Structures are given as C-alpha cells and as structure tokens.
C-alpha cells in the first residue's frame, strides 16, 4: 500500500511525514482494515503514546473496518478503557463485527458516524475440528464470547439483553441514523460549514 507523504514548513526548513504520523500529531488514529494482532498492537501503541503525552486531551479514532479477531479487538477496547484520555470514535465507511464494538466503546457522548457509514452487529464466528471434547471446549468458549459481546453491546447501546440477542442472531446492518437510534453512537457528524 502506498502511504502518502505530507511536507510541513517549519522554522528550521521542511519536514516530511507519512500521513499517519502527521495525523497522530493531531491525536488522530486511523483504524482501517481487518482487526488482527498486528493492527491491535499498532493501535494500542498509539493510544498509550498519546495518553502519555497528554491524558487530558481527546484522542480521535476513525474506524473503517470489516472487523476481525475478537481477542485483538478486545485488547484495543481494554486499552481505550484503561487510559485516562477520552477516546472519541468515528465510523467512516464501515464499522462491522468487532469494529462495531470498538465504535460503541468510545467515550459516551463522543461516539459518531459519518452520514453514509454502515454499522454491522452479529454473533461471533468460529469453528472447530478435532476430537469431540475439543469441539465441545471450542463451542463453550464461543458461547462465553457471545455472552460477553452481547453484554457489552447492551451496556453501550442501552438496549436490553434480549433485544441484543435477537439482533445479533444474524447480520444486523444499520445506517448511521439507525445506529444512533439504537444507541451505538451518539450523533452523526456533518460538515457545519455547508
């Protein structure tokens, strides 16, 4: 992937940044693509860095992701909740599956979506093979994970657990307005200058 470079003029001359480093200076983190261990480590490092710099200022996390590995996503969520800096989440494009959990776990009152963003919630996906005992262990683990995800969604949205169970039984797509009405985000971001 080609990463754009930004040139900044300073008193000491020009300085070139990759676009993500330049955004990080403004406390902006881009969570885009599949959620996996590598991405989670990068996002967590950025969260910790920004929190260490100034834990009184907001961090802005822009999310455009189809979701991914639950343990990786939960590591991001746990870090968001561990640091002192408020984390504002903004869905751009798609916040699906694990990415919808990260979106909903943003600071209350600071969870947003752009007007044409899509949010998708569903039950965890998984599979198992091997001996019957191993399959049973895997099935029990995915049921525990489903319960945890449903409880997080209920807490963040204000929906009762039965509604969450019903709505995550299959893929449940939402527009930005539907996600706001559901309680997963607080508002829809629009350009105030237009």
From Swiss-Prot:
Q: Where in the cell is it found?
A: Cytoplasm
The catalytic residues are 97, 122
Domain of life per record = Bacteria
Q: Name one GO molecular function term.
A: serine-type endopeptidase activity
One of its GO biological process terms is:
protein quality control for misfolded or incompletely synthesized proteins
Key words, A-Z: Cytoplasm, Hydrolase, Protease, Serine protease
Full protein name: ATP-dependent Clp protease proteolytic subunit
